[in-house]
Amino acid sequence: MRQEGWHTGNPRRKYLSVVYNGIDIWNNLSPYIESFSYEDSVDESDTISISLSDRDLKWSRTWLPEKGDKMSPSIILENWNYEGEKMTVVCGAFLVDDYSFSCPPFSCTINGVSAPVDTSFKESENTKTWENATVRLIANEIAAKYGLELIFEVSEDIAVSKTEQDKQPDSEFLKNLCEKYGLGIKVYSNRLVIWDLKQYFEKSPVLTIVPDMVSKWTYNSTIQGTYTGAKVSYANPNNENTVEILVGTEERLYKTNQKADSEADARRIGESILRNANRKERTMKLTIPPKMSLYATCNVKLSGFGNLDGKYFVEKVSHSLSGKSYDMQVSLSCISRDSENSEVESKNETAQTNGNTAHGNYTVVKGDSLWSIAKHFYGSGSKSQDLYQKNRDLIESEAVKRGKKDSGNGYFIYPGMSLIIP
């Protein structure tokens, strides 16, 4: 790739290091490369694409790639921001999944996907029933099956009383299981990484992006496919009756056919449904010069974009290199606007004033549930029934006033109610 001049004696340089089937081939590859792209994504497998000139017909003859070949590219920048600087983006390990040739001019494109060397992870259909397990136990067994190291970045493991894998590839089954509980999953450099989206949303931004840093941006806001609430059912362990709970509010309701194991399980599934669906509510795409601190699953802050300012989750980072340029396209989903951050801080201050020491009163605000209030004061939503029993008369009478038959064991509470926090 062509070197670009810089304002000191040392030039800015960008180039690739490519290890192909365990052999460093950059010296052989560099005269032919025309462009390279790398996509780092939350919901999809990472991908790479290399476009090459095949004027000597080496790629279509002697160097013909094969599907399943292993590539490990890295992007290297030298003297990019200051003299003597060297930055490296390790893209990971990829398998060649397709390649093509075209003429004229003679050219070759090689595409790779991040996956284990054993392709049966995504292709072979398996059937198995899991009982009295956890998400971590299931993930660990599947990871070991393909020689992957499991990285489980979830603060609390999730119990699974029973789940069935019915003629599904292991990758599809595990992805569906993780999505059910609001977990992300990704294969990267022979590691199977599982993380909690909620925990990642709570991380501090790694970078503040202002308009001067951006060469192009687009913003989109939609309610299509987004929800204010979700209904999830589970079997009451005392009488086996089906109990349906509401997470959120009823304005735009999603009703899932997924069955939960308990109330806590139903709450987590409902919260996960809303969190995943509402990631598309407010989105933004930016084109910026390379920032090595940006990667999928990190958070950034937008500042100077007016009402669009706020905290955003990085959904995808696309690196595009050619002889003339190196740009990054970054896809973001809004976690919270700056105005919403202020509302949350105000709400937290009100909660502290009303008795954040688990002794006193708390005034219900829009969006609250007994579960969320219990989690705030006690650290666990399972204490919600203690709150219900202490405030039962108030909760039931208020539900009747609002036209309900009853409160559904405390599922319906209303803004302005003053609850005793025992």
Predicted segments — roles?
Residues 2, 107-118, 150-218, 410-411, ...:
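Short beta-strand-centered interaction patches in the first periplasmic/extracellular domains
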Residues 76, 303-305, 375:
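Short, surface-exposed secondary-structure boundary micro-motifs
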Residues 118-141, 152-176, 288-290, 365-367:
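Short acidic/polar beta-strand-loop edge motifs in secreted extracellular
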Residues 124-126, 353-381, 385-389, 412, ...:
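Primarily a LysM-type cell-wall glycan-binding module
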Residues 58-149:
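Surface-exposed cap/loop segments at beta↔alpha junctions
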Residues 156-157, 388-409:
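Short acidic beta-strand-loop surface patches of small beta-rich interaction domains
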